[in-house]
């Protein structure tokens, strides 16, 4: 599969770090370092616009090392880049850590994962007819316990 990209001057294409990687690294396209205070959210540009084939999306996900070591997360994970979007890909990062984190120019800040999309047809049933019954029913939010 090919994703056509338009790059701002000095921006980098997404790049897979290893042969078996499912996520391609996205880099910060910034001129100066940006300090992210604990609890703060920032919007970081990548300098990339993508032409994603119809029937696919690009999911923006956190980098595990940034999350574990520094508490840096992609807030709306996974973020979705739709096939019909043509604007710059920007990453919403949040610092859930205890110290200020510095985003450096060209730093790998997130991963892009290409995934197929299925658009469903949504229909309505009246409440008398209802949904089909399951053993789970409407139980959620930890109903199976912690162990």
From Swiss-Prot:
Pfam families: dUTPase
UniProt cross-references to InterPro entries, sorted A to Z: dUTPase, dUTPase-like, dUTPase-like_sf, dUTPase_trimeric
Catalytic activity, reaction form: dUTP + H2O = dUMP + diphosphate + H(+)
Keywords: Hydrolase, Magnesium, Metal-binding, Nucleotide metabolism
Enzyme class, first EC level, given as a word: hydrolase
Enzyme Commission code(s) on record: 3.6.1.23
Cofactor: Mg(2+)
Keyword Electron transport belongs to the record: no
Chain positions recorded as substrate binding sites: 63-65, 76, 80-82
Domain of life: Bacteria
Pathway: Pyrimidine metabolism; dUMP biosynthesis; dUMP from dCTP (dUTP route): step 2/2
Entry keyword Zinc-finger: no
Gene Ontology MF terms: dUTP diphosphatase activity; magnesium ion binding
CDD domains per UniProt: trimeric_dUTPase
Family: Belongs to the dUTPase family.
HAMAP family documented for this protein: dUTPase_bact
Role summary: This enzyme is involved in nucleotide metabolism: it produces dUMP, the immediate precursor of thymidine nucleotides and it decreases the intracellular concentration of dUTP so that uracil cannot be incorporated into DNA.
Matching NCBIfam families: dut, PRK00601.1
Name of the molecule in the record: Deoxyuridine 5'-triphosphate nucleotidohydrolase
Gene (UniProt): dut
